[in-house]
């Protein structure tokens, strides 16, 4: 790690570290989306299988902070795939989230969302989380208090932006290759 990099915790670099609703409102046929970890895809949430809840229940959850904002980092924190499903939320829908998903909102004066996203996606961080921060035997999970104390190394903002541009370029090439492979397989 270079000397200009800083070491901090998730709690110190985020303005918000929370999770979704700990209660599950009744499903309705028409209403607002309510997403859980089962609705994760590699690059977003799949709303085709999302539950719907009443607008009244949705508004209560929105006021409780269970609705992500654009560029929030969403992390699946419960179940067999805990800390595998990680996205930067960039979709226009405004779902309420269940407690199986953590919401991280970075303090952009310290860390840009994309930098934290790529940090959390790195194999070494994932291994560290599974080895040192996970709990639960029947249903593995990471709890918010452990999220908050996780260490994160980060450079100055201008260097974060340079690194992110490299990672984004690689990610875009991977996505293009996957599309080509899927077309060839079809």
Which residues make up each language-model segment?
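Sequence-specific dsDNA recognition surfaces
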Residues: 7-26, 38-73
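A generic structural signal for short beta-strands and their flanking turns/coil linkers
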Residues: 31, 49, 98-100
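A short glycine-rich beta-alpha junction/loop motif
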Residues: 94-101, 114, 134-164
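A short beta-sheet element
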Residues: 36-37, 55-122
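Flexible, active-site-proximal loop/turn residues at the rims of small-molecule/cofactor binding pockets
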Residues: 41, 80, 156
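Non-catalytic DNA-recognition/assembly elements of restriction-modification systems
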Residues: 1-20, 149-186
